[in-house]
């Protein structure tokens, strides 16, 4: 059985010669007190019969509340610690983090309380330099930054 697949968008912009990437902070009680090493790209599962690029664009919109306005291009594949393969697409565009409006998920909280609560999939979004992103994002996603740097250098 193949490992689960997900797809995501590494949105980037170039300002004054410096590259920045947009990362989101996952919502919910597990992530609420985590910051360094907790940020990630907008991503999610690829539905049966769905193209990875379409899934990446859909997940971007679900987790940010904004449609992807740039054409995504294949960047890399990353295997996360649990074995899931993430197909990453790069797109150059701007996004205002203040406009973040993520879809929500429901879970029992507190545990064993019988109470269901809703939490946003992403509670914050932020532009970060590549150096800051390396420190702040999930370790398993950091190779995406190397792939983006290599892609941008090859375009020069």
Label the model's feature ranges.
Residues 15-18, 28-31, 47-48, 82-83, ...:
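Short, charged/polar surface micro-motifs in flexible loops or helix N-caps
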Residues 41-75, 89, 129:
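The catalytic Nudix box helix
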Residues 117-123:
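Non-DNA-binding regulatory cores of transcription-related proteins
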Residues 1-41, 89:
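N-terminal strand-loop-strand
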Residues 77-114, 126-128, 148:
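Active-site-adjacent beta-strand/loop module that shapes the phosphate/pyrophosphate-binding cleft
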Residues 36, 40, 66, 84-86, ...:
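Membrane-topology and secretion signals of cell-surface/extracellular proteins
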Residues 33, 49, 136:
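Residues that scaffold the ATP/ADP-binding catalytic core of kinase and kinase-like folds
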